[in-house]
Swiss-Prot record:
Protein's name according to its UniProt entry: Dynamin-related protein 5A
Renumbered residue ranges of the record's region G4 motif: 211-214
Pfam families reported in the protein's UniProt record: Dynamin_M (PF01031), Dynamin_N (PF00350), GED (PF02212)
Chain's role: Microtubule-associated force-producing protein.
Cross-referenced PROSITE patterns: G_DYNAMIN_1 (PS00410), G_DYNAMIN_2 (PS51718), GED (PS51388)
Domain Dynamin-type G span(s) in chain numbering: 31-300
Binding of GTP, residues: 41-48, 142-146, 211-214
Natural source organism: Glycine max (Soybean)
Subcellular location: Cytoplasm, Cytoskeleton, Phragmoplast
Protein family: Belongs to the TRAFAC class dynamin-like GTPase superfamily. Dynamin/Fzo/YdjA family.
G3 motif: region residues: 142-145
Any one of the GO BP annotations: receptor-mediated endocytosis
Length: 610
């Protein structure tokens, strides 16, 4: 069971070392979940004397006004009988104090280091561990004494500042409140009882300690309070008799003071029946036992919190990415790895692993055929246009058998309109590839970490796509131009010949320009153009895929990689510039993760019985 208090002691020290003081922050706090005993009392309530009685040593700064200006986490460790007593501070890990006067001075000096030689307060705790055969295993948090007025040298807000600090500790459900109240004052005016009642109205977490019982007016006693009739708490009140100022001035040691305290309760008729549960020795043992019980009950919940928070911290650190390498080689490698991640995500979109690539097929299967169907060949092949072009093609010598030059001009003028849908298909695929680049950039976590690199990679990828688009447009339009430049002769050879059985032409040279003749030419040309459209409907997608999609998968960032190899260290560094807020957040998260992992290891190492 003693291991449990030691466990919490270790975790508390780790919290302070790694900056977790339980303050409100954007980071998860382990400090707030740890069971602790907070010592609360007004100034001159005897709070310091109670702590020194529990420890058995004079070690706390004394004086008028606010003496305790930072939380003091006091961790007591029982060691073997005959061993020498010593103290250690967390901020001086390799120094042992055997002189407790020096301990008092170091508490004062460390307070001044944080707050300056003023009467300001600080929430950053001081950790003091005391090792002695005369103590029980126990952890207490000594908080600044509550006050009602600011004195000279203190800010006007000091009353509220102290109250807020005390409240921040005792309002936590895992905090045990040790409320120190002087018996020679009306309990209704007790600062400790007042504030503890506000945060613990049922009294389930509050342990009442009554000091200065021996200083009460003659004819009065504290029996009603100690027996719980005046103010009931879940745990019995404990009375203590501290050393007087005269005793302190005479350096009366704690052993003698404890003996006199026992004698007082045993010999005073009003308290004799309560003597077995009075005094600082009983208080220390009771607190140690109660703290062990609370820790044991809270450990499973703390373990669950630690495991959950570790997962959350690791996830956020993953989202923020790794810190930047210092050397040029490391920077170049980091950039290359990030670019490869982006490139793979882009390929995954094209290959169907991620959504988006199917839209390219939609261009080929729907948009291109629909655009080809919308071409108005009937306008090109109207009677007037056919007659006009054939007549112009004949010139001053009319054709003898078939108007070949007219055919060619009509076919060329029809096929040339296919360039529009072909070019539109190239542009549509280019637009989709750009969209996939932007998607891949947004899905590459490391690029979110480096805005400069994100812009450069995006620009380089789009530049590559534009070069590929230009090449695709050239190759695709060349397919259309090839169809215009050379006709498929076999198509015309296979057309049925319009001759009678005698082999004489049906149309004479004089009626070759009539509507029937021109209609026949239009029908023939339309059949040929439709055949070419069917061919291009298959070949245009092949050209686009070869020149754009395939090339984008193969060499999207090749030009960027070439330029990257030429960059100087300064330029590489600029690509990996991070938002300072992200850098600070990552550092804070890494420290907090270290704390939680340390706590997890400490808990796992302790064999505690359920």
């Amino acid at each position: 069971m003693e291991n449990l208090i030691s466990l919490v002691n270790k975790i508390q020290r780790a919290c302070t070392a790694l900056g977790d003081h339980g303050e409100n922050s954007a980071l998860p706090t382990l400090w707030d979940s740890l069971p602790a005993i907070a010592v609360v009392g007004g100034q001159s309530s005897g709070k310091s004397s109670v702590l020194e009685s529990v420890v058995g040593k004079d070690f706390l700064p004394r004086g008028s006004g606010i003496v305790t200006r930072r939380p003091l986490v006091l961790q007591l460790h029982k060691i073997e009988e005959g061993s020498r007593e010593y103290a250690e501070f967390l901020h001086l890990p390799r120094k042992r104090f055997t002189d407790f006067v020096a301990v008092r001075k170091e508490i004062q000096d460390e307070t001044d280091r944080e707050t300056g030689r003023t009467k300001q307060i600080s929430t950053v705790p001081i950790h003091l561990s005391i090792y002695s055969p005369n103590v029980v295993n126990l952890t207490l948090v000594d908080l600044p004494g509550l006050t009602k007025v600011a004195v000279e040298g203190q800010p006007d807000s000091i009353v509220k500042d102290i109250e807020d600090m005390v409240r921040s500790y005792i309002e936590k459900p895992n905090c045990i409140i040790l409320a120190i109240s002087p018996a020679n004052q009306d309990l209704a005016t007790s600062d400790a009882i007042k504030i503890s009642r506000e945060v613990d109205p049922t009294g389930d977490r509050t342990i009442g300690v009554l000091t200065k019982i021996d200083l009460m007016d003659k004819g009065t006693d504290a029996v009603d309070i100690l027996e719980g009739r005046a103010y009931r708490l879940k745990f019995p009140w404990i009375g203590v008799v501290n050393r007087s100022q005269q005793d302190i001035n005479k350096n009366v040691d704690m052993i003698a003071a404890r003996r006199r305290e026992r004698e007082y309760f045993n010999s005073t008729p009003e308290y004799k029946h309560l003597a077995n549960r009075m005094g600082s020795e009983h208080l220390a043992k009771m607190l140690s036992k109660h703290l062990e019980t609370v820790i044991k009950s809270k450990i499973p919940g703390i373990q669950s919190l630690i495991n959950k928070t570790i997962a959350e911290l690791e996830a956020e650190l993953t989202r923020l990415g790794k810190p930047v390498a210092a050397d040029a080689g490391g920077k170049l490698y980091a950039i290359m790895e990030i670019c490869r991640s982006f490139d793979q995500i882009f390929k995954d979109h094209l290959d169907g692993v991620r959504p988006g690539g199917d839209k390219i097929y939609n261009v080929f299967d729907n948009q291109l055929p629909a655009a080809l169907k919308r071409l108005q060949f009937d306008k090109q092949l109207s009677m007037e246009n056919i007659r006009k072009l054939i007549t112009e093609a004949d010139g001053y010598q009319p054709h003898l058998i078939a108007p070949e030059q007219g055919y060619r001009r009509l076919i060329e003028s029809s096929l040339i309109t296919i360039r529009g849908p072909a070019e539109a298909a190239v542009d549509a695929v280019h637009s989709l590839l750009k969209d996939l680049v932007h998607k891949a950039i947004s899905e590459t976590l490391d690029l979110k970490q480096y805005p400069g690199l994100r812009v450069e990679v995006g620009a380089a990828a789009v530049d590559s796509l534009e070069r590929m688009r230009d090449e695709s447009k050239r190759a695709t339009l060349q397919l259309v131009d090839m169809e215009c430049g050379y006709l498929t002769v076999d198509f015309f050879r296979k057309l049925p010949q319009d001759v009678d059985k005698g082999g004489n032409p049906t149309h004479s040279i004089f009626d070759r320009y009539n509507d029937s003749y021109l209609r026949r030419i239009g029908t023939t040309i339309l059949s040929y153009v439709n055949m070419v459209c069917a061919t291009l409907r298959n070949s245009i997608p092949k050209s686009i895929v070869y020149c754009q999609v395939r090339e984008a998968k193969r060499s999207l960032l090749d030009h960027f990689f070439t330029e990257l190899g030429k960059m100087e260290t300064k330029r590489l560094s600029s690509l990996l510039n991070e938002d300072p807020a992200i850098m600070e957040r990552r550092s804070a998260l890494a420290k907090r993760l270290e704390l939680y992992r340390s706590a997890q290891a400490e808990i796992d190492a302790v064999a505690w019985s359920k």
